[in-house]
Design a protein with these regions (language model features):
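Active-site-adjacent structural elements in enzyme catalytic cores
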Residues: 1-185
């Protein structure tokens, strides 16, 4: 269903579709944890309609030509509509407000701790999404680890599960380190 982070295990599907389906076959948690890549090959220039595990760079190597990303999903304004299904709704978004902080490790830790302190003063329940390497540096109500920064597969695998955990923990705001995962989109 739209408006929720994508399901990564049978319990998530049951929660999202309760009363709407008769049965769930549980094959275990997803292997990767992020959306599949959708690509349009109907034009001369291949276009990624929904970014996922397979990057435009990977596709370019296989196809032997440049692969572009649908301008409708990267446009700053709302004038261009995405071509792919599933890009219209905020199905990646947790219920809480979320801020992603980018920069050097030292800067990110300092900024997130500053944000945590200011929101704590407002009485908000706060989650921080970090890595194994940095989780000990945060003092939030909830600190969740995406795994090791060196393990892109783990980070991708944990993304939607952690966003759902934040929903279940009923946090008001989430501060997250940014994650560059060039190998997996």
């Amino acid at each position: 269903t739209s408006g929720r982070p994508s399901p990564t295990e049978a319990a998530h599907v049951a929660e999202d579709l309760s009363g709407k389906i008769a049965m769930i076959i549980d094959g275990g948690p997803v292997g990767i944890g992020i959306e599949s890549t959708i690509i349009d090959l109907t034009e001369d220039t291949p276009m990624v309609l929904r970014p996922g595990y397979i990057t435009p760079q990977m596709l370019s190597k296989v196809l032997g030509k440049e692969v572009i990303i649908d301008p409708g999903i990267i446009a700053a304004d709302d004038t261009r509509k995405p071509k792919a299904p599933g890009m219209k709704y905020k199905h990646y978004a947790p219920k809480a407000d979320m801020v992603i902080v980018d920069g050097t490790r030292k800067h990110v830790i300092a900024k997130i701790n500053e944000l945590v302190a200011s929101h704590r003063d407002d009485g908000k329940k706060i989650a921080v999404i970090a890595t194994e390497e940095t989780k000990q540096f945060y003092d939030a109500d909830v600190v969740l680890s995406m795994g090791s920064r060196a393990d892109e597969d783990s980070i991708a695998h944990e993304l939607y599960r952690i966003l759902r955990d934040c929903d279940e923990l009923d946090v008001d705001v989430i501060f997250s380190e940014s994650f560059s995962t060039p190998r997996i989109g």
